[in-house]
Amino acid sequence: MFTVLTRQPCEQAGLKALYRTPTIIALVVLLVSIVVLVSITVIQIHKQEVLPPGLKYGIVLDAGSSRTTVYVYQWPAEKENNTGVVSQTFKCSVKGSGISSYGNNPQDVPRAFEECMQKVKGQVPSHLHGSTPIHLGATAGMRLLRLQNETAANEVLESIQSYFKSQPFDFRGAQIISGQEEGVYGWITANYLMGNFLEKNLWHMWVHPHGVETTGALDLGGASTQISFVAGEKMDLNTSDIMQVSLYGYVYTLYTHSFQCYGRNEAEKKFLAMLLQNSPTKNHLTNPCYPRDYSISFTMGHVFDSLCTVDQRPESYNPNDVITFEGTGDPSLCKEKVASIFDFKACHDQETCSFDGVYQPKIKGPFVAFAGFYYTASALNLSGSFSLDTFNSSTWNFCSQNWSQLPLLLPKFDEVYARSYCFSANYIYHLFVNGYKFTEETWPQIHFEKEVGNSSIAWSLGYMLSLTNQIPAESPLIRLPIEPPVFVGTLAFFTAAALLCLAFLAYLCSATRRKRHSEHAFDHAVDSD
């Protein structure tokens, strides 16, 4: 009898079921893993959002001859043609006089800054304090102090540097800027605020405006005055008053000159010294620019302890002697006398000369007059643009007033300024008309302005714009739809799952082939028997 060896149907069905279920599970897991991997990769790549790289801040202290003003500026860290789009966010006036008045007590300068600096700390996010640059630029007052007493000027700057190094900001130094730099930075500020460098197009992108004419800048401080503009004619490039300025990818050839000792305060000292020189009496004088019924006494030192008037000192000079000036409120005589502080004859009627023999190309285009120019026009109840006749008639009317009438005319009455507005107005007339050569036709092109929008017209903004050329731009930030740790973890998990499924399926395929091979061998053995 023979025994037949064969697999029962039940056994074969059980083996097939044993392999089929894991295979289906592995295929499903593999398919799901592939779908998830493709999906999160597509989402991560195509749904990412490009964010602006945030804001940067900068602080500039404008240390003028009569006061110090602190400005806080901000701009996008990603810049336009290497220059930041800067805006003013905060302004604080330091109490007291300018830093040049601390020549005899430089250790007291930091105390004056403290109140404003505490406010500034609240304007800049605390986590950005360490990366926020702070600069102090001193102007004509310190330029004069350096010429008069370099040691005192250096001690004032050293005291300032010591103070700011203890502050949380990135202190970049305290320096005395040149008159030429002051003029250029003022010109940059004026044109930037008026949109002559950049404007937003329909797509809200910053672009250079086509065919826009730049605006000249007229700045009046306490110790100096500046004029800056792009001339229309060929300029004498051999003079030091020609500068090239690069902003937002464009280069501008600029004429700029700073007149030391012709700021409002120093010019008035020159005027008082001239009155003393021409007076038969040396202790009681009349002043045609002071209002009627007003008198004031100064020491000789107040008038002559300045480099701007030292050459006008009388022979018997004693800084403690007292001089009394009595106002006569004479508009005609005031206008005549003020002209004498300028040396117009030095130009010998040359068209390309302003005064004191200084070269100046012919003026061209619109101008903005700010700082002291604006405040004087405002005292005359004038602002914006107006005719030369209007300016002259307003000056005449103001200079004709009694002292008791001035508080009624001035919104903010301050004796120091009120007594001098008549002088300042006549000073502006001679500077603009006989010096810069503005005429009845070109005068209305002068716009007397204090600020544009929320930003003051001051050299400090132009200084900040220039500095942003040297501050590296940051790349835009990319915000991903899936946080990187989650994305990496998910990617690793489903990649591992897919690989395990592939390995398992490969194992099943190999096991199936071995099984079939053994079945084939078994059947062959049975047939042989």
Swiss-Prot record:
**Top-level lineage group:** Eukaryota
Primary site of residence:
membrane
GO CC annotations, alphabetized: plasma membrane
* Keyword Transferase in record: no
* Binding residues annotated for ATP, in chain numbering: G222, A223, S224, T225, Q226
Indicate the residues that form the catalytic site: E182
Q: What is the catalytic activity of this protein?
A: a ribonucleoside 5'-triphosphate + 2 H2O = a ribonucleoside 5'-phosphate + 2 phosphate + 2 H(+)
State the Gene3D superfamilies in the record: 3.30.420.40, Exopolyphosphatase. Domain 2
Cellular compartments annotated: Cell membrane
Q: Residue ranges, Extracellular compartment?
A: 44-485
Tissue specificity annotation: Expressed in adult brain, pancreas, spleen and prostate. Moderate or low expression is seen in most tissues. Not expressed in liver and peripheral blood leukocytes.
Keywords in alphabetical order? ATP-binding, Calcium, Cell membrane, Disulfide bond, Glycoprotein, Hydrolase, Magnesium, Membrane, Nucleotide-binding, Transmembrane, Transmembrane helix
The positions flagged as glycosylation sites are N81, N149, N238, N381, N392, N402, N454
**Which residue ranges run through the membrane?**
23-43, 486-506
What's the cofactor?
Ca(2+); Mg(2+)
The outcome of changing E182Q is: Complete loss of activity
Which family does the record assign? Answer: Belongs to the GDA1/CD39 NTPase family.
Q: What does this protein do?
A: Has a threefold preference for the hydrolysis of ATP over ADP.
Protein's recorded name: Ectonucleoside triphosphate diphosphohydrolase 3
What is the originating organism of this protein? Homo sapiens (Human)
Q: Taxonomically, what lineage is the organism?
A: Eukaryota, Metazoa, Chordata, Craniata, Vertebrata
Its gene is ENTPD3
